[in-house]
């Protein structure tokens, strides 16, 4: 993923060339080969094993000298997926974690690393090491040029972190992560998404001031308000698309979904609709439950992209004794009768939007 990188992979594999795996460096894995007095080599797991092999060959103990070269780093890293799990021993870790689900990497090492891991895994484990391979784009400057010291166009992430926070930078990069296209990063984009972070925080404060019940479970049988049914159906649709896009690795679509729902649907419209309901005895209890529940579920959708602010709000408002990162998503499927309320509210929004545009 994206599919266009398949051609790059297969082009290299179909035109494969001999590979010299030895390097003359002072770091790396020393080649496990020992040489006898007549330069016969003995490949073994250890010096002791090589000595036993040599003794069997020569009929006596002889002095062995290990090859001074080291393995090419791409050879060593090609074994990474199973060598780190104590292969060739059949350990629990090897059984549990091989093969992996997905590898995330850059296009520039598809051949150097990805293809070689595939080859090694297929040969030694009889199974490829990954189900999916996600090729992420490069981050360039706002003009699309590659960052370099000589050009003076390097964007220091530490500076952005200090000015706008980790969550804002994470969300910005996710929103710009369109498969097949390099990211054109400008500080103004990060600055713009800082407003989104503030919007989430302000929404939480507003709800908390109105004694909203930040709950993780609701009883849909007792829901009567059109505003409640509408926002629940809106959330259901967003959540469905959210999981669909996760399966397709469309992370920019996920960011767009949660951004639009949180800022526009929830904050701009829903909160405005329910402000008076907090003071209405007939509507207050349901409004506090539904608004709190939807906000909590929205935090879950935001958490993979913005872990710090969402975790802080969860611990402060929902449950100080558990972490949001350990919670499960609650996949919803609300009653179809809620669709009538959704159509009704959307019609109101359409009318109000038209009136605003007349100003």
Predicted ranges, named:
Residues 55-65, 88-97, 120-132, 141-142, ...:
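Secondary-structure transition/capping motifs at alpha-helix termini
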Residues 1-7, 92-106, 153-158, 178-190, ...:
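Glycine- and acidic
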Residues 1-98, 128, 132, 152, ...:
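Cys/His-rich finger/ribbon microdomains and the adjacent scaffold used
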Residues 110-126, 352-359:
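Metal-dependent nuclease catalytic cores in nucleic-acid-processing enzymes
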Residues 16, 74-78, 110, 118, ...:
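Short alpha-helical scaffolding segments that buttress acidic/His motifs in well-ordered protein cores
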Residues 1-35, 145, 151-196, 201, ...:
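Residue patterns forming the tRNA-binding/recognition surfaces of aminoacyl-tRNA synthetases
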Residues 35-37, 42-43, 64, 141, ...:
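Acidic, turn-prone loop/beta-hairpin segments
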